[in-house]
Amino acid sequence: MNIEKSTMLSTALANFDRVCSLLGDEYSPDLLQKLRYPKERSELRLSPQFSDGRIHTIHAFIVHHSDAIGPCKGGIRMSPTVTLDDVTALAMEMTWKCALIGVPFGGGKSGIVADPLTLSPDDKQTLIRSFTRNARRNIHPLVYVPAPDMGTNERDMGYIKDTISYSLGYATTQGSYVTGKPVIMGGIPGRREATGRGVVLSTMEALSTLGGSIKGARVIVQGFGNVGAGAAETFAEMGAKVIGVSDVDEAIYDEKGLNVVALLEHVRKTGSLRGAGQGRVVSHDAILEMPCDVLAPCATADQITVKNAAKIQAKIIAEGANGPTSTEADAILAQRGLYVIPDILCNAGGVFVSYLEYTQETQQEQMTREEVLARLDKRMKDKFKLVHDTATTRKLHTREAAMYLAVRNVCAAHIARGALP
């Protein structure tokens, strides 16, 4: 298979190729080569009829990267710029993330080429239901279990669950076809904030490891969507000083600290950080280069590049987004001695709580928010320690250590299944 390399995919492949050199003596080249490519890539042509009366043609993609450990798991991204290669990279990253955090899932991802900001609520529902009908053979509790991602939310997951359940003649809350749903439909309390909270928990461990504390730590959060806003809120609750935030419209900075609660309320009312009335407005490039203890890129891929890696003044990079650091920039950060919490560890809180949702729905139980967060806290701390100790023992950078552990787990699953001799 000849995969055209996008920036996101080239970064994912470079991270994988780097760890293959560490695993070459443990596993066969054929097995490692197998993991370099997805199991299945599907392109869909959706034909929803929107409220304007027209039938629109919209492209969508589904990628199943690996199901060696369990059914594929990964969100549905809705964006006018998402590509098949992007979805392939994200599915591959989900394989490593699930293997590292220790949940019985493989990696998958979906992409819908549409701008959610230009769709009315009714048209978005129509599009999501059209996607579900066309993707029906791909979505199943034992095949691929979607979740929210950029441009989609828990309401959309409810539409997916309802569409499938209705077609099967099941009650809406029967069958774990999707996670990240509304709690009333079988979702789990704590899922919405799980990814952002995981970012903060791993950062707390990193600060402690380096002899610091979350109390008073100066934090900049890039991105103010579900992950970034959740992380900023939790950072503030834990005693950190959030001195900078940004979204697609505006970046603001105040070395004395921002009122995160007020920012969240402003965004809830207006949908944007613009006009928040706090701090001073800076450029989106500048916010990444301001002095701080922790920089949490929680927006999109390739935000830390060769152009700014040498200018970043943070001590810790907490990768709340998927693939926010390019391969070349990663080498610069490592050379400078910055502590990077890699994305497959840092933002794994979401898929861990999705696993809890999957299991509780299968068993027809209901966990409390306190139970969910307690289990999340322990898992993030345990896996951070494992990655840090592996990096120290094997003299690896943290990303290499995380990838080493993840890929080794997937290889072990393949061998246990007898997929290859």
Where are the regions a protein language model picked out?
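Glycine-rich, N-terminal phosphate-binding loop and its surrounding beta-alpha-beta segment
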Residues: 44-116
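Adenosine-phosphate binding glycine-rich loop
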Residues: 2-7, 206-207, 310-421
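Flexible, glycine/charged-enriched surface loops at secondary-structure junctions
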Residues: 26-32, 102, 140-148, 172-174, ...
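Glycine/serine-rich phosphate-binding loop and adjoining beta1-alpha1 elements at the start
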Residues: 99-215
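Glycine-rich phosphate/diphosphate-binding loop of Rossmann-like nucleotide-binding domains
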Residues: 181-182, 186-289
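Short, Gly/Pro- and small/polar-rich lid/capping loops
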Residues: 2-45
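Rossmann-like adenosine-cofactor binding region
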Residues: 250-340
